[in-house]
Amino acid sequence: MHATEACLAAFEATRDERFLDRATLLADHIVQRQTAQTDGLMIWEHYRADRSIDWGYNRHNSSNIFRPWGYQPGHFTQWAKLLLILERDRPLPWLLRRA
């Protein structure tokens, strides 16, 4: 998410299409490929090295606010914002639907 945000900021500053390409690729991999593991419903926070969801990561450690079990609801809002920013400069059909 933060890498996508950085790429979008770099594109805004430079208008270099490479940054927009990277932001698009990152967004596609997270909000389409990775969410396919949850039937397209959610972006999970923690993954294993093989990119499969780690459903149990920190499940029994509720005190760790920086690496919580499950997902952070605010990250859904952040992804929606980033997808809408991306759609402004690269109107791909999946962006609005996924936002």
Give the residues covered by each predicted segment.
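Glycan-recognition and catalytic cores of secretory/periplasmic carbohydrate-active enzymes
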Residues: 1-99
